[in-house]
C-alpha cells in the first residue's frame, strides 16, 4: 500500500518556477486547460468578467437609493428586506418591481403569504398585466420556481414574500402539533447555495422579504431575529431593515406614516446608512416628500426656522405646506428633482473615482515591486533546490 501511495504522489508533479516569463507561459497553459475542461469563461481576470461598476435597480425612494450608495439595489445579487408587521416591506419591494418594469425588465412575484393586493400594486406603478405571479403551496415549490425563473435568464427581478411564511412539505404532511426543528433553515441553506451562482450569472436581482421574531430569554442586546436560519444573512449582498415611524395626519385622519430604513449589510457600498421617507396609504412612497427632504439635505432647498425656500421662491411655512406648494407647482418640483439627480450622480461618480484611484495606486505599487524583484540578480542556483518526496506516515511505524 505504501509503495502504491508513493507511486501516485510521484506522478503528481508540482513545478517551482522562478523565471517571470516561464510563470506567464505556465499560467496561460493552466487557463487553457481549465477552459477546455469546464468551458469558455470558467476562469478569467476580474476586470474582463464584466463592467466593474455594479448595476443597480432604483428602489423608488431617492433617500434609500442614496443610502445604498449605488443608486438602488444591485443586480445579480440576493437582497433581504425585513422588519415588523405593516412597516412597508412589501411596499418597498413592489416599488423595486415597478422601477424594474420602467427600465424594460421582466419581473416575478412569488406570493408565499397569499396576500398580494393587485389594486395596491397597480397604484404603486406596477404593470400587473406583465408581472408574473405565483402562489406556491410549499417552501420547496417557491424556491424551485425562483430558481427556474432565474436560470431562464429572462427575468430581471424576483420578489419572494416572505421567508417566514414558507412551510416545508414535511410540515404540510404532519399534524398541527408536530415539531419540525430547523427544517426551514436547512431548506434556505440549500436554496442559497443553489441560487447565488444562478442569479449572478443571469444578472437577476432576487429580493427576499422576511419578518422578525423574538428570541426567548435574551436579557441583554437585541432580542429580535429573522426566521429561516443564518444562510440568508450570509448570502445576501444587501440587508435592509424597515420600521414604521410616526403617523402622518390631516386633522384626525391618518393618511400614512414615516418609514425608517437602515442598510444593515452592504457588500457594494459602505453599510449602516439610514434614511426616512413617507409612505401614504394606498399610494406608496411619497415622491414630493422625498424631493423636499433630499433637497434640504443636499442644500438645494434652504430651511430657516419653519420656512422652506428655493432660490427666490418661498415654498411655505412647515413641511406640509411646502409639500403642497411643490404639488401645485410641478415645474419647480421637476427642476429641484433634476438637481437632486445630478448631485447624487456626482456623489456616486466621486465614490467610484476614489475606488479607481485606490486600485491604480495598488497596481503601481505592485508593478514597482515586480520591477525591483526582476532587477535583483538570481543568486540561487538550480542545485540549491531539492525535490522532497512526501513522507508516508504509515511507513514510519514499520
UniProtKB/Swiss-Prot annotation:
Keyword DNA damage in record: yes
Gene Ontology CC entries for this record: cytosol
Residues that hold ATP according to the record: 83-90
GO biological process: DNA recombination; DNA repair; SOS response
Keyword Transport set for record: no
Assigned protein family: Belongs to the RecA family.
Function statement: Can catalyze the hydrolysis of ATP in the presence of single-stranded DNA, the ATP-dependent uptake of single-stranded DNA by duplex DNA, and the ATP-dependent hybridization of homologous single-stranded DNAs. It interacts with LexA causing its activation and leading to its autocatalytic cleavage.
Gene: recA
PROSITE patterns: RECA_1, RECA_2, RECA_3
Any Pfam family: RecA_C
Residue span of region Disordered: 351-398
UniProt-recorded Gene Ontology molecular function terms: ATP binding; ATP hydrolysis activity; ATP-dependent DNA damage sensor activity; damaged DNA binding; single-stranded DNA binding
Disulphide bonds in the chain: none
UniProt-annotated location(s): Cytoplasm
UniProt superkingdom: Bacteria
The entry's keywords: ATP-binding, Cytoplasm, DNA damage, DNA recombination, DNA repair, DNA-binding, Nucleotide-binding, SOS response
The protein, known as: Protein RecA
Bias-annotated ranges (Basic and acidic residues): 354-365
HAMAP family: RecA
Signal peptide: none
Biological source species: Ruminococcus albus (strain ATCC 27210 / DSM 20455 / JCM 14654 / NCDO 2250 / 7)
Record-linked InterPro entries: AAA+_ATPase (IPR003593), DNA_recomb/repair_RecA (IPR013765), DNA_recomb/repair_RecA_CS (IPR020584), P-loop_NTPase (IPR027417), RecA-like_C (IPR049261), RecA-like_N (IPR049428), RecA_ATP-bd (IPR020588), RecA_C_sf (IPR023400)
Composition bias type Acidic residues, residue spans: 375-389
Amino acid at each position: 500500500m505504501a509503495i502504491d501511495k508513493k507511486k501516485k504522489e510521484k506522478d503528481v508533479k508540482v513545478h517551482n518556477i522562478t523565471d517571470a516569463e516561464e510563470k506567464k507561459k505556465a499560467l496561460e497553459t493552466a487557463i487553457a486547460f481549465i477552459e477546455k475542461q469546464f468551458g469558455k469563461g470558467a476562469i478569467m481576470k476580474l476586470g474582463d468578467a464584466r463592467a466593474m461598476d455594479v448595476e443597480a435597480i432604483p428602489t423608488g425612494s431617492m433617500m434609500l437609493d442614496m443610502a445604498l450608495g449605488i443608486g438602488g439595489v444591485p443586480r445579480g445579487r440576493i437582497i433581504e428586506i425585513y422588519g415588523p408587521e405593516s412597516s412597508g416591506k412589501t411596499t418597498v419591494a413592489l416599488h423595486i418591481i415597478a422601477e424594474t418594469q420602467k427600465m424594460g425588465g421582466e419581473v416575478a412575484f412569488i406570493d408565499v403569504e397569499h396576500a398580494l393586493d393587485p389594486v395596491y400594486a397597480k397604484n404603486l406603478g406596477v404593470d400587473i398585466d406583465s408581472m408574473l405571479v405565483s402562489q406556491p403551496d410549499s417552501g420547496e415549490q417557491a424556491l424551485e420556481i425562483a430558481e427556474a425563473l432565474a436560470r431562464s435568464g429572462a427575468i430581471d427581478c424576483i420578489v419572494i414574500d416572505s421567508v417566514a411564511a414558507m412551510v416545508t412539505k414535511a410540515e404540510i404532511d404532519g399534524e398541527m402539533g408536530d415539531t419540525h426543528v430547523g427544517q426551514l433553515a436547512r431548506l434556505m441553506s440549500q436554496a442559497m447555495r443553489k441560487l447565488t451562482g444562478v442569479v449572478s450569472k443571469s444578472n437577476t436581482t432576487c429580493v427576499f422579504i422576511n419578518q422578525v421574531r423574538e428570541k426567548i430569554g435574551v436579557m441583554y442586546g437585541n432580542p429580535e431575529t429573522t426566521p429561516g436560519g443564518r444562510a440568508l444573512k450570509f448570502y445576501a449582498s444587501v440587508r435592509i431593515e424597515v420600521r414604521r415611524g410616526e403617523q402622518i395626519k390631516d386633522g384626525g385622519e391618518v393618511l400614512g406614516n414615516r418609514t425608517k430604513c437602515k442598510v444593515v449589510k452592504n457588500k457594494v457600498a459602505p453599510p449602516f446608512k439610514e434614511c426616512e421617507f413617507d409612505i401614504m396609504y394606498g399610494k406608496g412612497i411619497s415622491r414630493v416628500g422625498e424631493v423636499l427632504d433630499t433637497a434640504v439635505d443636499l442644500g438645494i432647498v434652504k430651511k430657516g426656522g419653519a420656512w422652506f425656500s428655493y432660490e427666490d421662491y418661498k415654498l411655505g411655512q412647515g413641511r406640509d405646506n411646502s409639500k403642497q406648494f411643490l404639488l401645485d407647482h410641478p415645474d419647480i418640483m421637476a427642476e429641484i428633482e433634476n438637481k437632486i439627480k445630478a448631485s447624487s450622480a456626482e456623489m456616486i461618480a466621486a465614490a467610484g473615482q476614489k475606488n479607481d484611484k485606490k486600485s491604480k495606486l495598488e497596481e503601481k505599487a505592485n508593478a514597482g515591486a515586480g520591477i525591483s524583484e526582476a532587477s535583483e540578480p538570481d543568486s540561487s542556483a538550480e542545485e540549491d533546490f531539492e525535490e522532497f518526496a512526501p513522507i508516508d506516515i504509515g511507513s514510519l511505524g514499520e
